[in-house]
């Protein structure tokens, strides 16, 4: 017993001489060399877990002379004599678990880290069991996990740890599979010689466990989202000449966005800054009227000084607030819709109070590109309601391309009392150079109600198929002859039973009937009655042969 302790220093020196790596096992798994005292637990080889090394030293006396006594380690916690523990670890991506692998007799047997299940198919293959017996044993297991896809060493039937240990003890392959059944098998990986590899494998396992949170990056504390990035009407971020007020002014940054380095009277977006409008603006804003035919996305803001203008959230110079302050209205008020004229749409900037005197001269050119009726009066304000069908009709484009009711809007806009004409590009223009608003003077504000209550008006365009169809249908309904009404209760006596055109049928009385012509008809003579007895002898009875030769 005293001579057993120096042996680990001789066999398991820090240099690990190569002759000690040989496996001294025969084909049946029994050790061929006899050792008086067994080697300590594998923790003496790997000095990291100190508690386990002490436990292995305490278990030495009870495990002495295992080969001579025929004792067999059924726990799988002690390494056989002269055997170095060899274990590898790979990440099983399909299952999201780390797998420890031990090779025995050229077969790789794997054990999972999360639930410690062991591949029973590979374990019984190490025992040299036939396929039929192996499959029969594994099918009888109550707790099993069948893996049919993946790497070859991971396929098979996975069984719990205790059942795998029982099979290994029955087949006498527990020592051959060392250190597969070691409880703290992960500690065998933390060795100074393979610390880099161990750290890489464990880091990969941690990344696999937390891969759901790996793609989320926390935003920078000072990086506020730009309104232009989230709103379809806004242009991109400016490239130069801007001082972000959110960083320069401190806590007041939430009320304003980056502004260009120009005079203080530069107007914000004249349409009321519809930044919180509903989600149909991608569809509507692309078809808003633009007088010069350019891209509507590039003409939404003033570009006189070379800055794509950003709309502020709470700027006091917003023209819609000065022009009536109806930004929080619903937009279905009839009075607002009746007085929604072209003058209001064009003179939004010119009719402002005297706080902004220089706007008429400095921003006269961008107005045709910016003003259109639904946004000029503050109708498309900040706190827009959900879905207003009437407002969708008035916000439609005059060229009739964006919604179902735009054809009627186009037809009614062409019937105007002024001298405006339709440009070849489909946009309505005036002689003063300003863009035509979305709602003209000749258009009724009660468009949807007119469709339900009024007769469709004929348009001057002969090719307006929708108009011609409505007018033709209306004329047909007026000039059609009403169908006759039949009253089953008040109608006159039916002529079916007693019709004057039909004579009554004669009634025949069999008793009082005169002699019928059927019995004795004068037209048909009575048939002669032949009496064969009184008949004179005829030539028929005489033989013809006598008459012929007589």
Curated annotation (Swiss-Prot):
Pfam hit, one: KilA-N
Phenotype reported upon loss of the gene: Lacks conidiophores and produces macroconidia at low frequencies only from intercalary phialides. Produces markedly fewer macroconidia and microconidia in infected plants but does not affect the disease-causing ability.
GO biological process terms, semicolon-separated: conidium formation; positive regulation of transcription by RNA polymerase II; sporulation resulting in formation of a cellular spore
Which locations, inside or outside the cell, does it occupy?
Nucleus
A molecular-function term among this protein's GO annotations: sequence-specific DNA binding
SMART domains, alphabetized: KilA-N (SM01252)
Bias regions of kind Basic and acidic residues — which residues? 385-395
Annotated segments matching region Nuclear localization domain = 517-546
Where do the record's region annotations for Disordered lie?
Answer: 246-277, 371-412, 447-467, 527-550
InterPro entries from the entry? EFG1/Phd1/StuA, HTH_APSES_sf, KilA/APSES_HTH, Tscrpt_reg_HTH_APSES-type
Q: Where is the HTH APSES-type domain?
A: 86-192
Keyword DNA-binding among UniProt keywords: yes
**SUPFAM superfamilies, sorted:** DNA-binding domain of Mlu1-box binding protein MBP1
The annotated regions of Polar residues compositional bias extend over 246-266
User: Which keywords describe this protein according to UniProt?
Assistant: Conidiation, DNA-binding, Nucleus, Sporulation, Transcription, Transcription regulation
- GO cellular component terms, A-Z: nucleus
The feature table lists the DNA-binding region at 120-141
* Keyword Nucleus attributed: yes
Supply the PANTHER family for this chain: PROTEIN SOK2-RELATED
Q: Which family does it belong to?
A: Belongs to the EFG1/PHD1/stuA family.
What is its biological role? Transcription factor that regulates asexual reproduction. Binds the StuA-response elements (StRE) with the consensus sequence 5'-(A/T)CGCG(T/A)N(A/C)-3' at the promoters of target genes. Differentially regulates the development of macroconidia, microconidia, and chlamydospores. Acts as a positive regulator for the development of macroconidia and as a negative regulator for the development of chlamydospores. Involved in microconidium formation specifically in infected plants.
Q: What is this protein called?
A: Cell pattern formation-associated protein STUA
- Cite the source lineage: Eukaryota, Fungi, Dikarya, Ascomycota, Pezizomycotina
